Amino acid sequence: GDNKPPKKGPPNGCFGHKIDRIGSHSGLGCNKVDDNKG
């Protein structure tokens, strides 16, 4: 279940439209957020 997006918001936005552009090059995507957590 690591490849599944968070229960908050749709898989298209994950965190929202704020991280949408940041996660693009930051790696904070749906299934990438867990890897970059720490």
From Swiss-Prot:
Taken from the UniProt entry, a GO cellular component term is: extracellular region
Q: How the protein is affected by changing N3A?
A: Little decrease of antiplatelet activity
Q: In which tissues is it expressed?
A: Expressed by the venom gland.
Main localisation, per the record?
A: secreted
Its keywords, alphabetically, are: Disulfide bond, Hemostasis impairing toxin, Hypotensive agent, Platelet aggregation inhibiting toxin, Secreted, Toxin
The processes (GO biological process) annotated in the record are:
regulation of blood pressure
- Family assignment from sequence similarity: Belongs to the natriuretic peptide family.
From the Swiss-Prot or TrEMBL record, give the protein name. Answer: Lebetin-2-alpha
**According to the entry, what is the taxonomic lineage of the organism?**
Eukaryota, Metazoa, Chordata, Craniata, Vertebrata
